[in-house]
Amino acid sequence: QTFHYSQGWTN
Protein backbone atom coordinates (compact mmCIF):
# COMPACT_ATOMS: atom_id res chain seq x y z
CA GLN A 1 0.00 0.00 0.00
CA THR A 2 1.59 3.22 -1.18
CA PHE A 3 0.44 6.83 -1.19
CA HIS A 4 0.26 8.73 -4.44
CA TYR A 5 -0.49 12.47 -4.44
CA SER A 6 -3.08 12.59 -7.23
CA GLN A 7 -4.40 9.01 -7.03
CA GLY A 8 -4.55 8.52 -3.28
CA TRP A 9 -4.03 5.04 -1.80
CA THR A 10 -3.10 2.33 -4.26
CA ASN A 11 -2.41 -1.32 -3.61
Curated annotation (Swiss-Prot):
Modified residues annotated as Asparagine amide in this record: 11
Keyword entries, A-Z: Amidation, Neuropeptide, Pyrrolidone carboxylic acid, Secreted
Annotated Gene Ontology cellular component terms: extracellular region
Primary location recorded for the protein, binned into one broad class: secreted
The family classification in the record reads: Belongs to the corazonin family.
What GO biological process terms are annotated to this protein in UniProt? Answer: neuropeptide signaling pathway
What is the organism field in this record?
Namaquaphasma ookiepense (Gladiator bug)
Q: Indicate what this protein is called per its UniProt record.
A: Corazonin
Task: Identify residues that carry Pyrrolidone carboxylic acid.
Answer: 1
What does the UniProt entry say about where the protein is found?
Answer: Secreted
Is Secreted one of the keywords? yes
The record describes the protein's role as:
Cardioactive peptide. Corazonin is probably involved in the physiological regulation of the heart beat.
Signal peptide per UniProt: none
